[in-house]
Amino acid sequence: TGQEAEKNAFGEGRLHIVENDLSAPELLTEKIQGSCDAFCHFGWGGSGSGARTGEQLQEENLRASLDTVRAAKALGCRRFLFSGSQAEYGMHQTRMTEETECAPRSAYGEAKLRMRRQGEALCKELGIRYIHLRIFSAYGPGDHPWTLVESCLDAFTGNAALSLGACTQKWNFIYITDLAKAVRALLETPEAAFEGLGNPVFNVAGDDTRPLKEFVEEIHRLCKGGGNCLYGDRKENAEGAVNLIPDIGKICRITGWKPETAFGEGIKKTLESR
């Protein structure tokens, strides 16, 4: 499991944990000795649906992220990878490529999109390669308890009822291990592969897109049919009933990465980790 791999890496001296406040990345230069090759920035406050409309919090996230770029430069990093979001795209009914127009419907999506523009400009100024991931619904062991997958697992294994929206929109999930491998692929791909690309964005998603209700029903079956779903009993989240129809051709072509874990397999692994 991921936790076992982390424990082994830590024990073998390959993983060093440095704690630092998300809002003060400049302190990292005092805590990390020597230079670094790359910086992966996944820290972002208020990513849950309830906090996505808070403009002040999202503005603070953006400021801290830009300061993190400066800290990465001070640490000697040549590549900066930022975790953007599907929320940047907004409402679409067709396949989303990295060139699809963005019209975010929440302060969260707007701030992530501003980081894509301002982060790229700052990295160019500092001489760092900027890579912007647009991640589509990652799931797996250790996920936040309020996510759809975790809420389904809690309800169905506990033989409880779960209030949901209509779940008629198209959706896409990516298992956490596949996401980690995508990040690794983008970090290890030679610099020449990125030269000439006018857009630093890479969609990172699974290869299985279908109505959200079908994913929920699959989780229900894998939980042996316990509990039940109350469709249409809950209002939609901050972005509304958004369709997720990602195109992952770019990252597959540039890095050779591809998703490996079928949704059902990922759910089984998540159940086993509980």
Regions found by a protein language model. Name each.
Residues 14-15, 19-60:
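NAD(P)H-binding glycine-rich loop region in Rossmannoid oxidoreductase-like domains
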Residues 159-274:
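C-terminal substrate-binding subdomain of Rossmann-fold SDR/epimerase-dehydratase oxidoreductases
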Residues 107, 111-114:
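Active-site helix of classical SDR
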Residues 94, 117-171, 176-187, 218-220:
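NAD(P)-dependent short-chain dehydrogenase/reductase
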Residues 38-41, 66-107:
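Conserved Rossmann-fold NAD(P)-dependent oxidoreductase catalytic core, especially the SDR/UDP-sugar
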Residues 37, 48, 55, 59-67, ...:
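Conserved internal alpha-helix in NAD(P)-dependent oxidoreductase domains
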Residues 43, 81-85, 105, 134-136, ...:
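Active-site beta-alpha turn of Rossmann-fold NAD(P)-dependent dehydrogenases/reductases
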Residues 49-56, 91-96, 144:
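Conserved catalytic-core motifs of eukaryotic protein kinase domains, centered on the activation segment
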